[in-house]
Swiss-Prot record:
Catalysed reactions, semicolon-separated: dTMP + ATP = dTDP + ADP
Entry keyword ATP-binding: yes
Amino acids binding ATP: 7-14
Keywords: ATP-binding, Kinase, Nucleotide biosynthesis, Nucleotide-binding, Transferase
Physiological role: Phosphorylation of dTMP to form dTDP in both de novo and salvage pathways of dTTP synthesis.
Organism expressing this protein natively: Nautilia profundicola (strain ATCC BAA-1463 / DSM 18972 / AmH)
Name of the featured protein: Thymidylate kinase
GO cellular component, one term: cytosol
Gene name for this UniProt entry: tmk
SUPFAM superfamilies: P-loop containing nucleoside triphosphate hydrolases
Superkingdom of the source species: Bacteria
GO molecular function: ATP binding; dTMP kinase activity
Family, per entry: Belongs to the thymidylate kinase family.
């Protein structure tokens, strides 16, 4: 089973992934986008720190995704895979600038049509997002602003709906333990864990 954990920056994905790794390190392959491969680490550095065009950014994300799918997802599709970000957020971010259908086709090409089978979306309200953003330094994506990030969040839901990928929406302003409990429920329901 291939599950994606999605959410905008500061939604708490990384915190949840670390908690899940501690519990399921022997049962789940944990990956992330961008930057899971050596190649991806270089791409991540460029995307978040260099001043590049939206089109160049899109193709860098696609290159990273293609490499991760080819080297880690494809050979392990028979196992449990949990990814911190995926094609869902890739399309959600890019559809602010590019056509949805074109993005789907580019991502199908990059992933050989391998998309997550289920998505967990951590959703933040505007006030919580504003507070959390005020507590950290911003990368190039976060610098695009509050309204941009809220739109991306809505786009993630739209992408799942349009691609007919089942998803669960979780309130990311809840406490860490409650969110973790809900995610573990999904894992126990969808993944074959020993």
């Amino acid at each position: 089973m291939y599950i994606a954990l999605e959410g905008i920056d500061t939604a708490g994905k990384s915190t949840q992934i670390e908690l899940l790794k501690n519990e399921y390190k022997n049962n789940i392959l944990f990956i992330k986008e961008p930057g899971f491969t050596k190649f991806g680490t270089k791409i991540r550095e460029i995307i978040f720190n260099d001043d590049i065009s939206k089109k160049a950014e899109l193709f860098l994300f696609l290159a990273d995704r293609a490499e991760t799918i080819e080297k880690f997802v494809k050979p392990n599709l028979h196992k449990n895979i949990l990814t911190d970000r995926s094609v869902i957020s890739g399309i959600a971010y890019a559809m602010e600038f590019f056509d949805f259908n074109m993005l789907v086709n580019l991502n199908k090409f990059a992933t050989d049509g391998i998309f997550p089978e289920f998505v967990i979306i951590l959703k933040l309200d505007k006030e919580t997002l504003q507070y959390r953003l005020s507590q950290k330094n911003h990368d190039n994506i976060e610098k695009r602003g509050l309204d941009y990030l809220i739109n991306i969040q809505d786009n993630m839901i739209e992408v799942c709906n349009r691609l007919e990928i089942p998803y669960l929406l979780l309130d990311a302003s809840k406490n860490i333990e409650e969110i973790n409990f809900r995610i573990k429920k999904v894992i126990s329901e969808y993944m074959d864990i020993d």
